[in-house]
């Protein structure tokens, strides 16, 4: 009978525990995985101290230094050797949408084949010359016929196919060289051009001539973004195969770049402002100020004769020296930007202002009057990327599931909310006060303003933790390393002191018996020792006055 009672008691306890579990996480999470925020009682919640950024994954493609890694306006980020000569070549990993090269004072397009044979230099452009087998310009359809037996190449999208095609050709017979030609893809007619000239800018009287009469002089050219280039994309041998998803190819509508600061996307404190009538002009500005591998000391104005003349008149030796040995020709001036520059911009459609900055953004601010763009982005105003309105609610739900998965097992019914204070669902904020709705937002976002922020943004756009909270975010590993370093340093100091004491205690004193030094006794090391040694009489004779006089004393021989 007792056994039956025990079984009944155990079953009752099991059912009670099972009931408690069902009242936990399962109650607030639906079968499809959605969190029922309205069922969470505020008295059973608390705020996590963990600093997270819901934009981290989304903003990876806007880290231009990482995803592109080279110059944008001028890309010469890699070195290649051809026949014992070093050359600089483009190496960016993302396409530069809308980038073209303008030949100064010329109606010739840079996509025209370079001049060969009896042609005048100014009759040609920068593209590959005619070859026995046509390789440029070539349509995508013809490229697919050319590589019909190579499935891995045919699997590429049109732009990647163009870049891959250009990378197959090397100069002359240098099969082992890393030198590869850049390419341009024109999406309007699906045509691929291989550029014969890797340079993207050639300016200044030393290097080129803008005079139309100088038909056989090198012409001047410069990279630009303008409306006639909107269908073009500048490509290199390093183009990423996943460029469609990993590069910032489009501008973002109803958005501006910002910096994530403890639960909220904040505006940049430091930025440059330009007046622009259109998004196209803003895109041109950020392109012109973007990362560039062009030599910084590039002379664009004075001719050598003018420099010498002015140097003599002004008695300026520096100008004369620059004429004889031009600046920008030194190895140290061969800049590699690695993608660092003013690569991002926010365009205000209402005030017609363009804000550019060189600090990578870590989030987006939803604003109906703005468009966020980059130096890599397309010039086309549509289609643009849409603002992800559900990003905050999704991240809040995800964090609640992760942070509270074991809460019932630990006997704790309190639900933790992440440090995200903006969402299109105000119930998901768990705000202790009434959230404020943003009027400029197209997503109808709500913001919780009554929770103290643990971070702030400095004047240089750096995100820092407030002093009163720093101790909570110091890494235990760093603290442990600091303790280990202090212990090692203390041990080294103690060891040094012990070694010093040991040698000092064993050092001969002033009254050391010199007779113990049998090999050196009587063989003074200096004339001074021989003449002034007061111990000259220590072998039994009385001291005499001569021990203070400069006379040579010797030990008698036994």
From Swiss-Prot:
Disulfide partners: 94-247, 162-192, 208-220, 265-363, 282-354, 389-443, 431-448, 433-450
Protein name per its UniProtKB record: Apical membrane antigen 1
Lineage: Eukaryota, Sar, Alveolata, Apicomplexa, Aconoidasida
Extracellular compartment spans: 22-480
A Pfam family the protein falls into: AMA-1
InterPro entries: Apmem_Ag1, Apmem_Ag1_dom_sf
Glycosylation sites (chain numbering): 20, 189, 231, 249, 276, 288, 412
GO CC field: membrane
Family: Belongs to the apicomplexan parasites AMA1 family.
Superkingdom of this protein's organism: Eukaryota
Mode of membrane association: Single-pass type I membrane protein
Transmembrane segments: 481-503
Keywords: Disulfide bond, Glycoprotein, Malaria, Membrane, Signal, Transmembrane, Transmembrane helix
Segments on the Cytoplasmic face: 504-558
Function: Involved in parasite invasion of erythrocytes.
Main location per the UniProt record: membrane
Location(s) in or outside the cell: Membrane
Signal sequence segment: 1-21
């Amino acid at each position: 009978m007792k056994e039956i009672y025990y079984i009944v008691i155990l079953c009752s306890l099991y059912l009670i525990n099972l009931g408690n579990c069902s009242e936990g996480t399962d109650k607030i999470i639906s079968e499809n995985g959605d969190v029922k925020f309205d069922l969470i009682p505020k008295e059973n919640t608390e705020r996590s101290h963990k600093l997270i950024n819901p934009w981290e994954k989304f903003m990876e493609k806007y880290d231009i230094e990482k995803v592109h890694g080279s110059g944008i306006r001028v890309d010469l980020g890699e070195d290649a050797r051809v026949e014992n000569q070093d050359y600089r070549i483009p190496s960016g990993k993302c396409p530069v949408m809308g980038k073209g090269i303008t030949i100064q004072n010329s109606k010739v397009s840079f996509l025209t084949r370079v001049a060969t044979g009896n042609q005048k230099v100014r009759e040609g452009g920068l593209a590959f010359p005619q070859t026995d087998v046509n390789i440029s310009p070539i349509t995508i359809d013809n490229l697919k016929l050319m590589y019909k037996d190579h499935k891995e190449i045919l699997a590429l999208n049109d732009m990647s196919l163009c870049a891959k095609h250009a990378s197959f050709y090397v100069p002359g017979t240098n099969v082992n060289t890393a030198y590869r030609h850049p390419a341009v893809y024109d999406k309007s007619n699906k045509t691929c051009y291989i550029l014969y000239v890797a340079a993207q800018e050639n300016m200044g009287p030393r290097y080129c001539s803008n005079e139309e009469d100088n038909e056989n002089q090198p012409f001047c050219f410069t990279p630009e973004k303008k409306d006639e280039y909107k269908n073009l994309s500048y490509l290199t041998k390093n183009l990423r195969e996943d460029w469609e998803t990993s590069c910032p190819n489009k501008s973002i509508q109803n958005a501006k770049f910002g910096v994530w600061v403890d639960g909220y996307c904040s505006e940049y404190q430091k930025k440059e402002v330009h007046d622009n009538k259109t998004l196209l002009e803003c895109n041109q500005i950020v392109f012109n100020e973007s990362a560039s591998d062009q030599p910084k000391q590039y002379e664009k104005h004075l001719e050598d004769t003018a420099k010498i003349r002015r140097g003599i008149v002004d008695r300026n030796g520096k100008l004369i020296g620059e004429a004889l040995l031009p600046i920008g020709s030194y190895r140290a001036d061969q800049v590699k930007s690695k993608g660092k520059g003013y690569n991002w911009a926010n365009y205000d459609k209402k005030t017609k202002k363009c804000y550019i900055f060189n600090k990578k953004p870590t989030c987006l601010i939803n604003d109906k009057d703005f468009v966020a763009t980059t130096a890599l982005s397309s010039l086309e105003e549509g289609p643009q990327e849409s603002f992800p309105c559900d990003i905050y609610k999704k991240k809040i739900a995800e964090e609640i599931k992760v942070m509270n998965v074991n809460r019932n097992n630990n006997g704790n019914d309190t639900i933790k909310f992440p440090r995200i204070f903006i969402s299109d669902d105000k119930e998901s904020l768990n705000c202790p006060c009434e959230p404020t709705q943003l009027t400029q937002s197209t997503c109808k976002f709500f913001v919780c303003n009554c929770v103290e922020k643990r971070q702030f943004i400095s004047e240089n756009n750096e995100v820092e933790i407030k002093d009163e909270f720093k101790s909570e975010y110091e890494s235990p590993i760093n603290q442990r390393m600091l303790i280990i370093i202090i212990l090692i340093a203390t041990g080294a100091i103690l060891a040094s002191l012990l070694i010093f004491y040991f040698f000092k205690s064993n050092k001969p004193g002033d009254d050391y018996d010199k007779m113990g030094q049998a090999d050196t006794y009587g063989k003074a090391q200096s004339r001074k020792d021989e003449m002034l040694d007061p111990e000259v009489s220590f072998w039994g004779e009385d001291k005499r006055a001569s021990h203070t006089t400069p006379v040579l004393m010797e030990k008698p021989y036994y």
